Amino acid sequence: DAQGAPPTIPFWRGEAPARTADLSREVARLKEDIAHRLVDDQAPLPASAPPVRWLRQECCLDQRGAQQAVEYILAGKAVLGTVPTQHTIVAERFFDESGGMQLVIHAPFGGRVNRAWGLALQKRFCVAFDFELQAAATDEGIVLSLGEKHSFPLDTVFAFLNAKTVREVLTQAVLQAPMFMTRWRWNATRALALLRFIGGK
């Protein structure tokens, strides 16, 4: 339990390596393949359930691993009503124990895309509500911590950014983020680093 704090470490405080775009696409496709093979949304699954058999044959998982993978997909589908993929993005909103609103966008695009998307959304929300908010991103989605007074129809979250303005919004967000200065210094240090001796010279 985060006790009112952001649920994960904000991504600009400790950037971890993100999944590649290719791996993110394959993970999302695997989830989609499992979801399409579901016959019954009830757990526990019988050993002969179609997605379990498929995972054992195609992905070389053992029985328990295949069942856990399918149960993971079932649990998410039970809560969200669908399985988030790169073709089906799900927005979810709930109030935490402290009364703050959490907006979660389930989008398995990988950390690189989700960090950029999260920064741009954070900037848009800050401008729209005149309120500094926390954002965190993972390989599987984005979390925005909003106040209890910030209300909007959930489906409008996808209209906060569009292809015409996203570059400008993201540029403004990155320039104001501590991540920009940290990365700038890191890159400048690496660019100026000279080896003392190379081949005896």
Protein language model regions, located:
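C-terminal effector modules of nucleic-acid-centric enzymes and ribosome-associated factors
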Residues: 1-201
